[in-house]
């Protein structure tokens, strides 16, 4: 396996360019587990390719770059097992050199090959100044006066979550739309002062799986109508693309695939995703799958020769997570 030198590799010390990864660094494998780098080789590759997926993400490497390839038969077997329990036919990494001469579409024009998304990434537990649920709710619900409002139907749940972390709820007036204003003691913005964040800090995005699920739960309860029961789909909207991209990274680190759409009439970006872990009581998602989701390969195209980096780990398959979407490669 070799990825191009400028590809970003997820490490325990945040993202690193592939050409900056060193022996002894800790990275993450296809199952989201921590593994250690034992070999790094730099070389110039004359035959390089760019792989494009159906969510417009790309990854570049030489012809030896490998993916866990799912074909139509494999996906049919997953459906037969209802995507809940594994079966005997295990996926193996397939190199690009074995794919570049194949058609990526079947006779009906449907995309043939897909790769599974990573499992939730096992970042270490963090010592966070504000509990994840409380922080996520506060960050995306507060007004300029640092007041919050309850969401109709979830007031008792929200109050209980805050109280379970030692916060006293002080209620204000109830609005005509059913929302009630409230503040907390201690005040969250005073706990964070003087550096009050306007976006998700890195230590929250790199917290443990349980902490990130709690963070996402708080964010999804912070506004009304963020879950579409009919489509079993969550959404998060903002006019700030950087904010949406942060939530996208949070969701994808938990194994889900996402998409972002722009509404020019409202000048708003909306993140859409499905999430198999239950974070809202009205959620009707099916059980967790063998693989949380999948990306379809839309194109494999030659690109210019360039420096590449071959990385081996002490894991059983040398898999690592690369780039946006935490794409698993080998």
Regions found by a protein language model. Give the residues of each.
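Polar, glycine-rich mid-to-C-terminal structural blocks
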Residues: 268-272, 277-280
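Surface-exposed, non-catalytic interaction/assembly patches
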Residues: 277-304
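Intein-associated homing endonuclease modules of the LAGLIDADG/DOD-type, together
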Residues: 1, 23-32, 39-270, 295-330
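Protein maturation boundaries and topogenic segments
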Residues: 1-21
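Short, functionally important structural connectors and interaction interfaces within domains
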Residues: 10-13, 120-122, 292
């Amino acid at each position: 396996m070799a990825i191009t030198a400028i590809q970003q590799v997820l490490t325990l010390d945040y993202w690193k360019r592939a050409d900056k990864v060193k022996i002894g660094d800790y990275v993450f494998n296809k199952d989201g587990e921590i593994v250690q780098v034992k070999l790094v080789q730099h070389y110039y590759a004359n035959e390089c390719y760019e792989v494009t997926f159906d969510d417009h993400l790309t990854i570049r490497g030489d012809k030896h770059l490998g993916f866990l390839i799912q074909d139509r038969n494999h996906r049919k077997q997953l459906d037969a097992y209802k995507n809940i329990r594994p079966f005997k036919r295990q996926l193996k990494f397939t190199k690009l050199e074995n794919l570049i001469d194949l058609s990526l579409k079947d006779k009906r024009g449907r995309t043939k090959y897909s790769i599974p998304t990573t499992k939730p990434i096992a970042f270490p537990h963090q010592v966070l100044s504000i509990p994840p649920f409380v922080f996520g709710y506060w960050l995306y619900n507060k007004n300029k006066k640092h007041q919050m409002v309850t969401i109709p139907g979830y007031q008792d749940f929200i109050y209980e979550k805050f109280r379970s972390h030692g916060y006293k709820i002080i209620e204000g007036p109830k609005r005509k739309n059913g929302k009630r204003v409230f503040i907390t003691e201690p005040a969250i913005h005073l706990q964070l002062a003087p550096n009050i964040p306007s976006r998700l800090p890195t230590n929250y995005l790199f917290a443990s799986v349980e902490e990130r699920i709690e963070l996402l739960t708080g964010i999804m309860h912070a506004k009304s109508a963020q879950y579409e029961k009919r489509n079993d789909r969550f959404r998060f909207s903002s006019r700030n693309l950087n904010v949406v991209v942060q939530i996208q990274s949070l969701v994808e680190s938990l194994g889900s695939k996402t998409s972002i759409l722009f509404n020019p009439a409202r000048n708003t970006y909306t993140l859409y995703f499905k999430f198999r872990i239950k974070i809202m009581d009205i959620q009707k998602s099916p059980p967790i799958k063998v693989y949380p989701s999948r990306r379809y390969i839309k194109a494999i195209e030659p690109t210019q020769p360039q420096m590449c980096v071959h990385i081996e780990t002490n894991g059983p398959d040398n898999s690592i997570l690369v780039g946006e979407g935490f794409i698993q490669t080998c």
